[in-house]
Regions:
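Symmetry-related core transmembrane helices of the 12-TM Major Facilitator Superfamily/SLC fold
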Residues: 166-183, 381-399
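Helix-loop boundary and gating motifs at the non-cytosolic
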Residues: 2-52, 225-233, 237-264
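Helix-to-loop junctions at the C-terminal end of transmembrane segments
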Residues: 58-72, 158-159, 275-287, 373-374
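Central cavity-lining transmembrane alpha-helices of secondary-active solute carriers
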Residues: 46-64, 266-278
Length: 413
């Protein structure tokens, strides 16, 4: 089982690496690409907001389908969504660009990209819940390192060749995303009854795990504190999305350029690796609920630090807090949801995390961020983000309690 775990960790690391370099191109450099196509900040905000709104619809639908479907595997569902993204992106590259065409395709591509991210997490958890000791944090950290390298080089490429290089880079990266997802599967050894009993995988539990998945409304009625937690998650990610989307504007505000933006993104992503890679050991010492609260606090600290940054170097320094904010929150929240939510609704639970931190936060941050930038400037935008994130931290502290892992079986922490 250890050999299978190592193999699947590497394969999942390949998925995370390829996905996050593609995200770097299509999402983190979205403002750069769209500015070059003569979109203003408000229009960019609307495009990314509509993408997030569409993902709000797609994520629950795909999650419910994945929870209930007996014939279509989660991996095949992901591959279908990815071919859609690749086809749309190829159209955008081939066809002559117009305001309407770029807007519609960019919205669709980003909406589906946002949707597949939580499904990847569910894909990994399927194996972990069967007793495969994959190192999720290490695999996710590989994604961060890849994002860091891509941010640095893409920033340099844009300075040298212009923003038109972004789309071809994305297409090449996305071929790797499709390939890595196709390769992510492995046959597990058949367990003896004694091994099943040791792991708590008795026949009674298997029968219990085959219960019908809940509808969205019933799910939230059964998990009211989780719904409150999601509100807090959306609020702490509000500033995170603002900073990522409009980092080029923040850099220009303090005298920086596209290359500086790439360096800043690289610093943040490189520093994510230690926390993610060692999360499997950290979570044995500190409760996952405590880690989420700590990470939420550092989202607010990072936003406040960038608000006060007088120059490019201090913006770079502010990215150090990413190591305790985003880097801890990502694996901690996924482990938390896996322990909190019953098996038949786990894909839905992971997807709701995506709805909160990508869909809701992305919608509100991009919608208001562009308007705040055009009307009041960078400082007002960052101040708003810091206040919203601080409130989100308080909500998370109120709403999170350590889950009962025995109740839902298959806990990982």
């Amino acid at each position: 089982m250890e050999a299978i775990a190592r193999k699947l960790t590497l394969k999942f690391g390949f998925i995370q690496s390829s996905y996050w370099i593609s995200q770097c191109a299509i999402n983190s450099f979205a403002a750069v690409y769209l500015h070059a196509k003569n979109f203003d900040n408000t229009q960019i905000g609307f495009i990314l907001s509509f993408a997030a709104i569409l993902s709000l619809i797609l994520q629950p639908l795909t999650a419910s389908f994945a929870d209930k479907s007996k014939r279509v595997t989660l991996r095949h569902l992901l591959l279908a969504l990815m071919f859609l993204v690749f086809g749309l992106s190829l159209l955008l590259y081939i066809l002559p660009g117009s305001f309407l065409l770029i807007s519609v395709i960019y919205i669709l591509v980003n909406a589906v990209e946002f949707t597949v991210n939580p499904l990847f997490n569910s894909l990994a958890m399927e194996y972990m819940n069967q007793g495969v000791p994959m190192n999720y944090g290490l695999a996710r950290g590989m994604g961060s390192i890849s994002f860091a390298v891509m941010s640095f080089f893409l920033g340099s490429l844009v300075d040298k060749f212009g923003a038109d290089i972004i789309l071809p880079v994305f297409l090449v990266c996305y071929v790797l995303v499709i390939l890595s997802t196709y390769l992510f599967h492995d046959k597990l050894p058949v367990k003896s009854q004694e091994q099943k009993d040791v792991r708590g995988l008795s026949d009674n539990i298997v029968l219990e795990e085959e219960k019908e998945a809940s509808g969205i409304l019933t799910f939230f009625l059964d998990h009211k504190l989780f719904l409150l937690m999601l509100c807090g998650v959306a609020m702490i990610f509000y500033s995170h999305v603002l900073i990522n989307t409009y980092l080029i504007n923040i850099m220009e505000h303090v005298g920086g350029s596209g290359s500086d933006m790439g360096v800043s993104l690289s610093i943040a992503a490189f520093l994510e690796l230690p926390a993610m890679a060692f999360f499997i050991y950290i979570v044995k010492k500190i409760k996952v609920s405590t880690l989420i609260k700590l990470s939420a606090l550092f989202f607010a600290i990072k936003s406040f630090a960038i608000l006060l940054a007088p120059n490019v170097y201090m913006v770079h320094f502010s990215m150090v807090f990413q190591m305790i904010a985003f880097a801890l929150f990502t694996p901690a929240s996924i482990y938390f949801v896996n322990d909190l939510i019953e098996k038949e609704n786990r894909v839905k639970g992971q997807s709701m995390l995506g709805v909160a931190n990508i869909g809701v936060a992305g919608t509100l941050a991009n919608l208001t961020g562009g308007k705040l930038l055009d009307s009041y400037g960078v400082t007002a935008m960052l101040l708003t983000g810091t206040v919203v994130t601080a409130v989100g931290f308080l909500i998370i502290c109120i709403s999170i309690k350590e889950p009962d892992k025995q109740k839902n079986t298959g806990g990982l922490t």
